[in-house]
Amino acid sequence: FLSAYGQKNTELKLDEAGNFHTEMPVSHPSVAYLSVGGSVISFLLSPGGETKITVNLREMTRASSRLRKDAKPEGKKVYFEGLNAGLNTEMNSGLEIPLCSVELKDLYDMNPDQYKAYCMQKYEEADKAIYANKKISKAYAELLTVLNKDALYGLLCGYDYQLLQAYAQQKGLSVRDASKEYRSPE
């Protein structure tokens, strides 16, 4: 499956050689995701650009295999050509860069203003970690800061659901049952 952020998944049809071709119009630089088996490959698309992706299925399955994961790697899992090739390669290098996120256990009994302050703190911590990371390029750091802002936006827009989930988790209830009794603290 292939999907650009915020768009519907597109199922890809492979030819007999295992190749596919598709076009995905974007009006601005957008992160897209290619799902192959249980793995997800993220990459940047730009208007008017072309991106070629070669997936090394042999390596991808070796790396996720319990029996063969310690065997010698057989190349990279994915190769990129075309516009943003270097940045896309860096995005899939395996380096973990955490973005703004919350822990439900921390949210219990927070009111919306406390939640906003908590999210802003998590956002600032992630932003500092991105810029302090000397293993990534300036272009990748800039992309990550945009994605970090997007993560913050999603958390702030969904504050009511996040607080409800935290309440449900703390009380051992389903979200549906929790929604019947939950009231945001003032």
Where do the language-model regions lie?
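A non-transmembrane, solvent-exposed segment enriched in polar/low-complexity residues
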Residues: 1-139
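Extended amphipathic alpha-helical segments with heptad-repeat/coiled-coil character used for oligomerization
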Residues: 141-186
